[in-house]
Design a protein with these regions (language model features):
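Generic, low-specificity signal for short hydrophobic/alpha-helical stretches with a mild N-terminal bias
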Residues: 102, 106, 110, 132-139, ...
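Alpha-helical oligomerization segments
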Residues: 177-231
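Surface-exposed polar/charged interaction patches
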Residues: 33, 46, 86, 90, ...
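Alpha-helical context
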Residues: 56, 60-63, 100, 104, ...
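Extended amphipathic alpha-helical regions
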Residues: 124, 128-147, 161, 185-191, ...
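Terminal low-complexity "docking" segments
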Residues: 1-156
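Short helix/strand-capping turn motifs
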Residues: 136-183
Length: 231
């Protein structure tokens, strides 16, 4: 496995990334969102690479920072993780950690074609503007840093979605803090897991989740009582 690029290389790639078209639709608050990406890279000599695929944004969940650090990204490499970790360390981005949006790359394809990258981007933007059903973006970025370009686009989409998502979550009281200073959404999720844990296998899964979330001690007595009953 190649070593991750330096911070300077990653941030330079992010700086070279340009979002040509961003979808008017936002990420769903109470459901999954399939985000279609089209990343164009100028290869020189009148050639460009077009990479297209889907990033699945899972239903936003209120999660602990401990869980986010280990579980937020699936199937992304070290460069993408490094870029997003730096972005999320900024004060104005901390809310993303609370939502724990999980991105999973899938259905990726690529092709090399002839043409001018700006003109092709304009044509693809016109097509995207006519597609009201999809959530998709058109991005121009360096060929060697696809995942960094994706993170630039995804972060911008998340930042636009946060106010709307937060409003809908707050209306249901899911952002309020409850037991152990945990958001009510986390407590509700764990309560549901306890109610559905009718076998030792499910109890083991619940125990792993509590440890992944970094909240095992908060529910320790309740968990061992459940485990005792199921044995």
């Amino acid at each position: 496995m190649p070593a991750p690029d330096s911070t300077n290389e990653i941030w330079y790639a992010a700086r070279l990334t340009r979002i040509v078209y961003t979808p008017p639709r936002l990420l769903e608050t109470f459901g999954e969102t399939n985000v279609v990406y089209n990343v164009l890279s100028d290869l020189g000599n009148g050639q460009l690479r077009i990479r297209r695929g889907v990033v699945k944004a899972a239903r936003p969940r209120i999660l602990t920072p401990h869980f986010y650090q280990t579980q937020m990204l699936e199937n992304f490499g070290d460069n993408a993780r490094s870029y997003l970790d730096k972005v999320l360390s900024k004060k104005d981005s901390l809310r993303i950690i609370q939502y724990g949006l999980c991105f999973e790359k899938q259905e990726h394809s690529e092709q090399t074609v002839g043409g001018d990258v700006e003109e092709v981007a304009r044509q693809m933007t016109a097509d995207a503007e006519d597609d009201f059903a999809s959530v998709q973006g058109i991005i121009i970025g360096p060929d060697s840093h696809l995942e960094v370009s994706l993170m630039v686009f995804i972060n911008a989409l998340v930042q636009r979605s946060v106010p709307h998502n937060a409003h809908e979550l707050a209306n249901r009281g899911l952002l309020d803090l409850g037991l152990g200073g945990l958001p009510n959404a986390v407590i509700q999720e764990i309560n549901d897991d306890f109610a559905n844990a009718d076998s030792l296998a499910k109890a083991d899964d619940l125990g792993r989740k509590l440890r992944d979330y970094g909240i095992f001690e908060t529910f320790e007595d309740r968990f061992y009582e459940l485990y005792r009953r199921l044995r």
